[in-house]
Each structure stands twice: as structure tokens, then as C-alpha cells.
């Protein structure tokens, strides 16, 4: 059996010549062309296996059987239904309570609401403080006139004051890294980092802290840098300016 395509007009013409029910297009054309009409077995395409349809049919059958058992009450005890649906009572009973996150509740622990008095009576954890996170630093103790006078020049006094400040506030001294110029570093954790910022930085390490500072600037700039460092550590601005003035030769002398 062969297949051909015909236009709409020709199709309607052939169909209009049908004389009996079940007459095929081949029979009609043979009759119109006065050709012998043979009994031709109509072509039937081979069935195509579709496993997905079989599975769907199987699930639908199980679903129907499950519903019928629930309605008639003839289901076997201890045997779960093939398919459970939200409408079934068994399914609803099988659903656990919501296990999503609940505020104040951790796995295996149910917290109880606490009053403000209870919270205030609890001890603080290690590292916490009821006061400001910034520890109280006695900045007046930074200047020792005798030792300061023994330092060599403005650079020596500048370095000595920074080293003393690191000893007074070791946990906060990393804030010096926040003191920067326009496109230039004043403090760093390595000599190379300062030299990369400025080849003429003349970096020096602040004691043995691991922090480095540039020293190739004039005295006024050193004073401005020290004032900013002190205020970063929450020193009073007036006191910070007074301490920074000790870098100057006239004041120190």
C-alpha cells in the first residue's frame, strides 16, 4: 500500500463518488478508471509500545482500587493503599506536624519565653561586656616625659608613642590600618605593602607588633596621623592633639 497526497478539491471529488460505506479511495479510483476492483487488505500500522502509558494505566488502576477499598471498608488490615492522597484519612494521619523553623526553637530543644529580669540576671558570655565594646584606655599614661625625651628626633618620638599606644590597647590597635591618605597607605602589616604604596615610604616596624608605619613625612603630618589614630581608639580629640604635640622638638624638649 502506497500513500499519496492530493489537494482539497481532488479529495472532495473522490469522496463525492463514494457508493457504499467502507469503500476506500483506491476502490473509488479503480471504479472511476474502469480498473478491476480487488479486495485490498487495509494497511494497519504496527502497535508501538509506550511504557509510560502502561505505568500511568497501572497507577490509575491502583488509585481506583484504593478508593474503592476506603469507601467499602474492605481493605486488608496492615496493608497500605497503593496510592495515598491528601483526601484520604490515612494520608492525613500519616503527615507529621510541621518541622519547619520555629523562632527560638532548636532541634531537640524547646525554648521557653524569658522575662527581661531573667535575661538581665544571666551572666554574660566570654568576650562580652555590659559596657561599651571599647575597653577603657588611660591615654594620659601614654606620655612619659623622661623616656620621651630620650628618643631621637621626631621619628623616634612618633614611633615611641605608637609603640606605647599598642601596649595600652593591643586588641584595638588594628584600627591603625583604617588611617590612610589619598591613594597612600600610612600603616600596613608588612614593609613590602608600604613600599608598594610608596617607594619612598621609609617604613618602620612599630616595636614587635607586626604593624608597620611610613615615616618619610614631615612632623606636622606625623602629628596629624597620630591624632587620627588616637581618635580611632576613642581618645578625646583635645587630649589626642596634646599627645601628638609631644612629637614636636620644642614641646618634647
UniProtKB/Swiss-Prot annotation:
Stretches for region Disordered: 66-112
UniProt subcellular location: Cytoplasm
Start and end residues of each stretch annotated as Interaction with DNA: 154-155
Keyword DNA-binding found: yes
Cellular compartments per GO CC: cytoplasm
Keywords (A to Z) from UniProt: Cytoplasm, DNA replication inhibitor, DNA-binding
Task of the protein: Negative regulator of replication initiation, which contributes to regulation of DNA replication and ensures that replication initiation occurs exactly once per chromosome per cell cycle. Binds to pairs of hemimethylated GATC sequences in the oriC region, thus preventing assembly of replication proteins and re-initiation at newly replicated origins. Repression is relieved when the region becomes fully methylated.
Listed name of the protein: Negative modulator of initiation of replication
Organism of origin: Shewanella denitrificans (strain OS217 / ATCC BAA-1090 / DSM 15013)
Gene: seqA
Amino acid at each position: 500500500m502506497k500513500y499519496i497526497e492530493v489537494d482539497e478539491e481532488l479529495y472532495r471529488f473522490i469522496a463525492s463518488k463514494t457508493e457504499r460505506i467502507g469503500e476506500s479511495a483506491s476502490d473509488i479510483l479503480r471504479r472511476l478508471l474502469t480498473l478491476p476492483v480487488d479486495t485490498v487488505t487495509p494497511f494497519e500500522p504496527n502497535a508501538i509500545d509506550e511504557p509510560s502509558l502502561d505505568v500511568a494505566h497501572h497507577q490509575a488502576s491502583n488509585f481506583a482500587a484504593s478508593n474503592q477499598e476506603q469507601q467499602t471498608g474492605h481493605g486488608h488490615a496492615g496493608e497500605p493503599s497503593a496510592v495515598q492522597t491528601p483526601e484520604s484519612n490515612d494520608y492525613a494521619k500519616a503527615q507529621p506536624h510541621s518541622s519547619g523553623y520555629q523562632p527560638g526553637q532548636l532541634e531537640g530543644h524547646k525554648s521557653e519565653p524569658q522575662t527581661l529580669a531573667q535575661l538581665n540576671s544571666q551572666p554574660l558570655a566570654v568576650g562580652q561586656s555590659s559596657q561599651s565594646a571599647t575597653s577603657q584606655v588611660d591615654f594620659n599614661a601614654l606620655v612619659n616625659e623622661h623616656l620621651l625625651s630620650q628618643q631621637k628626633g621626631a621619628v623616634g618620638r612618633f614611633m615611641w608613642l605608637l609603640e606605647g599606644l599598642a601596649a595600652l590597647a593591643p586588641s584595638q590597635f588594628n584600627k591603625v590600618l583604617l588611617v590612610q591618605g589619598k591613594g597612600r597607605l600610612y600603616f600596613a602589616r608588612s614593609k613590602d605593602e608600604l613600599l608598594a604604596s610608596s617607594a619612598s615610604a621609609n617604613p618602620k616596624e612599630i616595636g614587635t607588633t607586626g604593624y608597620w608605619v611610613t615615616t618619610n613625612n614631615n612632623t606636622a603630618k606625623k602629628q596629624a596621623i597620630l591624632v587620627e589614630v588616637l581618635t580611632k581608639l576613642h581618645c578625646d580629640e583635645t587630649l589626642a592633639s596634646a599627645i601628638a604635640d609631644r612629637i614636636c622638638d620644642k614641646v618634647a624638649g
